[in-house]
């Protein structure tokens, strides 16, 4: 499987056994000005996340592109 991986958000071939791509988003102290933090990568199973963290998992090549946010002005 190929997934987008941060920090560069480039498409990379996942290690053997890691067939899930994920997009994890959450707010930090700069959320109001910069938007959510985003973490992209490969995993063997969809990662468990803490409350307040959104996770989306998928299993096709490059199915986790860097999200495009509508910027607040």
From Swiss-Prot:
The keyword Disulfide bond applies. GO terms for cellular component: extracellular region. Pfam families: Toxin_cobra-type. It is found in: Secreted. Expressed by the venom gland. GO terms for molecular function: acetylcholine receptor inhibitor activity; ion channel regulator activity; toxin activity. InterPro entries: Snake_3FTx, Snake_toxin-like_sf, Snake_toxin_con_site, Toxin_cobra-type. PROSITE patterns: SNAKE_TOXIN. Keywords: Acetylcholine receptor inhibiting toxin, Disulfide bond, Ion channel impairing toxin, Neurotoxin, Postsynaptic neurotoxin, Secreted, Toxin. It comes from the Eukaryota. SUPFAM superfamilies: Snake toxin-like. The keyword Metal-binding does not apply. Binds with high affinity to muscular (alpha-1/CHRNA1) and neuronal (alpha-7/CHRNA7) nicotinic acetylcholine receptor (nAChR) and inhibits acetylcholine from binding to the receptor, thereby impairing neuromuscular and neuronal transmission. This is Long neurotoxin 2. It comes from Ophiophagus hannah (King cobra).
């Amino acid at each position: 499987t190929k997934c987008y991986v941060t920090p560069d958000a480039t498409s990379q071939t996942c290690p053997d056994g890691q067939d899930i791509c994920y997009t994890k988003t959450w707010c930090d102290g700069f959320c109001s000005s910069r938007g959510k933090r985003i973490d992209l990568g490969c995993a063997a199973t969809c990662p468990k996340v803490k409350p307040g963290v959104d996770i989306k998992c998928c299993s096709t090549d490059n199915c986790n592109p860097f999200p495009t946010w509508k910027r607040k002005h």
